[in-house]
C-alpha cells in the first residue's frame, strides 16, 4: 500500500512523497524524496503526518517504522521551498490538522499516537531531520547514519524539540556542543552518547528494526499503550513543557531574512557533506 501527495514535476522523485507499507501489523513509513535527500517540503510533512496518524488509527497496526529512501534519512526543512525559490506543491492546512506547533510550544512533525514509532535512520539526519528522528520513540541507526544540528550555521532557531529532546537523550553539555558547533556525529558516536539504541550494518537496518517492532507487536497492546503513556508523562514534566515553550518562543520570534538563510544553504550543505564523507 502506498499513499501520499505528489510533488512538483521538476523536483519530484518517482512515486509519492511518502510511502506506506503495512505487513505483519507493522507500518513502514518511508520519506521518498531521495534526490532531495528527503528534505521536508510541505508535501513530505503532510504525507508523513497523515501516514503516522493513519497507522495510529489502524487497529491492524501495532508499531510504526519511520525511515528514508537512500541515501539520506532526512536533510531537514526544504530551504528552497521556505525561501520561495520553489512554491509548495500542496496548500497549507488549518491548525491541528497537520504538522505544527503544539500547545506546549513544540513543533510536531509527528502526531502523538498510542503506538511506538521506531526511527530507522539510514543516512544523514540533519537539523529538521534530526528533530523528526528525536520525535520517534527510539532510534536504530545504520552504520551510514550521520547526525547534525546546523541551526546555528544557518542562523535560525530550532522549534522541533532539539534543545529538549537531544539533551534528554545524550546529556545537556553534549547537546550544547552539537548545536553550537554544527558538527556531525557518526552512528557509533551517537550510540555511545545514547542518541540511538542500536547501530547495525546498513543492509540489516530494516530487518533488525522489523524484528524489534515484531517483538512489540507480540506483546499485550493495552500494556504497550499504557507504558508509552507513562513514559511520556515522565518526559513531559512541567519543567520540560516550559523548555518547549521557551524553544517555541525563540523560534517564533527569531526572524532572519529568508534570502539570508537561502544564501547560506550551499555553504552549509558543502560543509556538511565534507564532514559526513570524512566520517566514512
Question: Where do the model's predicted regions map?
Answer:
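Crotonase-fold acyl-CoA enzyme core
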Residues: 108-222
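Conserved CoA-thioester-binding segment of acyl-CoA-metabolizing enzymes
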Residues: 1-71
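A general structural signal for well-ordered alpha-helical segments in protein cores
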Residues: 79, 103, 163, 172-175, ...
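Hydrophobic/aromatic residues within transmembrane alpha-helices
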Residues: 29, 66, 78, 132-133, ...
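An acidic, glycine-rich surface segment that forms the CoA-thioester-binding/catalytic face
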Residues: 45-49, 53-56, 79-122, 247, ...
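Short, active-site-adjacent cap segments at secondary-structure transitions
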Residues: 71-75, 126, 231-234
Amino acid at each position: 500500500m502506498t499513499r501520499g501527495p505528489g510533488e512538483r514535476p521538476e523536483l519530484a522523485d518517482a512515486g509519492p512523497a511518502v510511502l506506506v507499507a503495512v505487513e505483519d501489523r507493522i507500518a513502514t513509513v518511508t520519506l521518498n524524496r531521495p534526490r532531495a535527500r528527503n528534505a521536508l517540503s510541505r508535501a513530505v510533512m503532510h504525507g508523513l503526518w497523515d501516514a503516522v496518524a493513519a497507522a495510529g488509527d489502524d487497529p491492524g497496526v501495532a508499531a510504526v517504522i519511520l525511515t528514508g529512501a537512500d541515501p539520506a534519512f532526512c536533510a531537514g526543512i526544504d530551504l528552497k521551498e521556505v525561501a520561495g525559490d520553489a512554491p509548495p506543491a500542496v496548500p497549507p492546512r488549518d491548525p491541528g490538522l497537520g504538522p505544527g506547533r503544539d500547545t506546549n510550544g513544540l513543533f510536531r512533525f509527528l502526531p502523538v499516537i498510542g503506538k511506538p514509532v521506531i526511527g530507522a535512520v539510514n543516512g544523514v539526519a540533519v537539523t529538521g531531520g534530526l528533530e523528526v528522528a528525536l520525535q520517534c520513540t527510539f532510534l536504530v541507526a545504520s552504520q551510514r547514519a550521520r547526525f547534525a544540528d546546523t541551526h546555528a550555521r544557518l542562523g535560525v532557531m530550532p522549534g522541533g524539540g532539539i534543545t529538549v529532546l537531544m539533551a534528554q537523550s545524550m546529556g545537556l553539555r553534549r547537546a550544547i556542543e552539537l548545536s553550537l558547533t554544527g558538527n556531525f556525529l557518526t552512528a557509533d558516536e551517537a550510540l555511545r552518547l545514547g542518541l540511538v539504541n542500536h547501530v547495525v550494518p546498513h543492509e540489516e537496518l530494516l530487518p533488525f528494526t522489523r524484528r524489534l517492532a515484531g517483538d512489540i507487536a507480540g506483546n499485550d497492546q493495552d500494556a504497550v499503550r499504557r507504558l508509552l503513556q507513562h513514559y511520556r508523562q515522565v518526559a513531559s514534566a512541567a519543567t520540560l513543557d516550559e523548555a518547549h515553550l521557551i524553544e517555541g518562543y525563540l523560534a517564533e520570534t527569531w526572524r532572519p531574512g529568508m534570502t539570508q538563510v537561502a544564501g547560506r544553504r550551499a555553504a552549509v550543505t558543502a560543509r556538511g557533506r565534507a564532514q559526513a564523507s570524512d566520517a566514512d
